[in-house]
């Protein structure tokens, strides 16, 4: 099966446009060029958006890694503190623990009172 306008069946004087009328062929080419340019601009926009998303993901991953290390160090610090408090509560130093709690309550009360007066 042969397509019209290809090979030997092309009408005389229509070389290069495959048998289409010049106006119809040019209109199709212009529409194709316009659609191609539109598609190119959309692909460029999507590409730049995906690159920006990639940069944002890298930054967020870096922040998450920093937060993870900070949480790990805080967890270790709190674990050591709780261990010391357990040792303190087990020993015969219950008076010292009671004094420390009373002093802490006093300090918080003073801070609360100072903030409230402002």
From Swiss-Prot:
Main subcellular location: endoplasmic reticulum
SUPFAM superfamilies assigned: SNARE fusion complex (SSF58038)
Key words, A-Z: Coiled coil, Endoplasmic reticulum, ER-Golgi transport, Golgi apparatus, Membrane, Phosphoprotein, Protein transport, Transmembrane, Transmembrane helix, Transport
GO cellular component: cis-Golgi network; cytosol; endoplasmic reticulum; endoplasmic reticulum membrane; Golgi membrane
Membrane topology term: Single-pass type IV membrane protein
Positions carrying Phosphoserine: 50
Domain of life, per lineage: Eukaryota
Gene Ontology terms: biological process: endoplasmic reticulum to Golgi vesicle-mediated transport; protein transport; vesicle-mediated transport
UniProt subcellular location: Endoplasmic reticulum membrane; Golgi apparatus, cis-Golgi network membrane; Golgi apparatus membrane
Residue intervals of the t-SNARE coiled-coil homology domain: 26-88
Regions crossing the membrane: 95-115
Keyword Cell cycle among UniProt keywords: no
Topological domains annotated Cytoplasmic: 1-94
Vesicular side stretches: 116-118
InterPro entries given in the database record: BET1_SNARE (IPR039899), T_SNARE_dom (IPR000727)
Function per UniProt: Required for vesicular transport from the ER to the Golgi complex. Functions as a SNARE involved in the docking process of ER-derived vesicles with the cis-Golgi membrane.
PANTHER family, A to Z: GOLGI SNARE BET1-RELATED
Quaternary organization: Interacts with SNARE complex members GOSR2, SEC22B and STX5. Interacts with LMAN1/ERGIC53. Interacts with STX17.
Protein name: BET1 homolog
Species annotation: Mus musculus (Mouse)
């Amino acid at each position: 099966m042969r397509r019209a306008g290809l090979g030997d069946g092309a009408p005389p004087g229509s070389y290069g446009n495959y048998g289409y009328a010049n106006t119809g062929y040019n209109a199709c080419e212009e529409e194709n060029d316009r659609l191609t340019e539109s598609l190119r601009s959309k692909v460029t926009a999507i590409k730049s958006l995906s690159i920006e998303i990639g940069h944002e993901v890298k930054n967020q991953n870096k922040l998450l890694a920093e937060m993870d290390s900070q949480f790990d160090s805080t967890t270790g610090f709190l674990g050591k503190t709780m261990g010391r408090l357990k040792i303190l509560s087990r020993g015969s130093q219950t008076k010292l623990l009671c004094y420390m709690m009373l002093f802490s309550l006093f300090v918080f009360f003073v801070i609360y009172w100072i903030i409230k007066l402002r």
